[in-house]
């Protein structure tokens, strides 16, 4: 460990570290804006920035395959799903004053306390540990595919069954039953049917 | 690269997501904060896998495999979660988690605003099962 510490300058960051730090700052800022902004659609768009920044961090850590999967699934699919969810629940465009609940100060206390504890422990534990980023990429598609289909085949297949079950469950949950639909049609004209419109 | 950089970034992202889960009121915003927490865990897994693939003799690349599994499970989670939120919004007319207190102990319904949709939902359920 001391040898490793001696061969790396502690306070002389390499170019990769500087890039990681800058992208990390952008990612963290976007994440903070995601959880603090009062405009719901803006929160989803800041989430895109945060997830894209994380994809760049994966690229800097030489995990290429994970980075592209992150771009495809998170930035591509999950954010679109969230935007559709916001639209379907008739989220207000513009500032909504009740985006934060009343216990935000307790939440802030908990978050800051856990952040301080985690950062302290992590920095203390891995003070003298370096990642060697030279040489072949640790997460290229060939390496990831080989390990996934040699050592992780059974969890992989189980996960595909889980995805199928989740899809069927989502369809069943979001399908309207006949009685509910008839009920909604019958009271669509009354003010109670449109109660939750603007909130 | 110093291992503390990705570890600290992931710890901070996790705590940001934790704040969002605790402080947000809209259910979809809570789901977005959960996504942030899952991504923080993914960053940790990838960083430690890259470190171990150099430091250890033999490695299963378990970090990257688990990251892929986490991403798939997060996709399933957001699908199911949004379906539940949409169903709640259809029944109650709100996706405000502070107002969904039917199973809470010691909380009377605040007023007619929360009372009426609840009884409406009960009637709707009875109608749907009949």
UniProtKB/Swiss-Prot annotation, chain B:
Pfam families recorded: Oxidored_q2
UniProt KW keywords: Cell membrane, Membrane, NAD, Quinone, Translocase, Transmembrane, Transmembrane helix, Transport
Domain of life according to the entry: Bacteria
Location(s), subcellular: Cell membrane
Gene Ontology CC annotations of this record: NADH dehydrogenase complex; plasma membrane
Coarse class of the protein's main subcellular location: membrane
Bias type Low complexity, positions: 114-123
GO biological process: ATP synthesis coupled electron transport
Family recorded in the similarity comment: Belongs to the complex I subunit 4L family.
Protein name from the UniProt record: NADH-quinone oxidoreductase subunit K 1
Natural source organism: Streptomyces coelicolor (strain ATCC BAA-471 / A3(2) / M145)
């Amino acid at each position: 460990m001391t040898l490793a510490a001696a061969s790396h300058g502690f306070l002389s960051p390499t170019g990769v570290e500087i890039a990681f730090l800058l992208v990390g700052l952008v990612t963290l800022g976007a994440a903070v804006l995601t959880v603090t902004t009062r405009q719901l659609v803006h929160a989803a768009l800041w989430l895109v920035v945060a997830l894209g920044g994380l994809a760049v961090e994966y690229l800097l850590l030489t995990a290429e395959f994970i980075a592209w999967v992150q771009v495809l699934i998170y930035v591509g699919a999950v954010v679109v799903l969230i935007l559709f969810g916001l639209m379907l629940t008739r989220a207000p465009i513009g500032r909504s004053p009740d985006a934060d609940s009343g216990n935000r100060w307790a939440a802030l206390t908990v978050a800051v306390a856990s952040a301080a504890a985690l950062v302290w422990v992590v920095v203390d534990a891995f003070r003298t540990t370096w990642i060697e980023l030279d040489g072949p990429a640790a997460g290229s598609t060939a390496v990831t595919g080989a390990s996934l289909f040699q050592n992780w085949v059974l969890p992989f297949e189980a996960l595909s069954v889980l995805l199928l079950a989740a899809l069927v469950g989502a369809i069943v949950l979001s399908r309207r039953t006949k009685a509910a639909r008839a009920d909604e049609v019958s009271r669509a004209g009354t003010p109670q049917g449109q109660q939750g419109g603007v909130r | 690269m110093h291992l503390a950089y990705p570890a600290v970034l992931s710890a901070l992202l996790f705590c940001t997501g934790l704040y969002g889960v605790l402080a947000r009121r809209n259910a979809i915003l809570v789901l977005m904060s959960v996504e942030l927490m899952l991504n923080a865990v993914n960053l940790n897994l990838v960083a430690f896998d890259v470190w171990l693939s150099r430091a250890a003799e033999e490695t299963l690349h378990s970090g990257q495999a688990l990251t892929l599994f986490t991403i798939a499970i997060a996709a399933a989670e957001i699908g199911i979660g949004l379906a539940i939120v949409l169903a709640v919004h259809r029944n109650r007319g709100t996706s405000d988690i502070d107002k969904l207190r039917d199973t809470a102990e010691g909380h009377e319904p605040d007023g007619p605003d929360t009372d009426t949709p609840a009884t409406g939902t009960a009637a709707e359920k009875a109608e749907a099962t009949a």
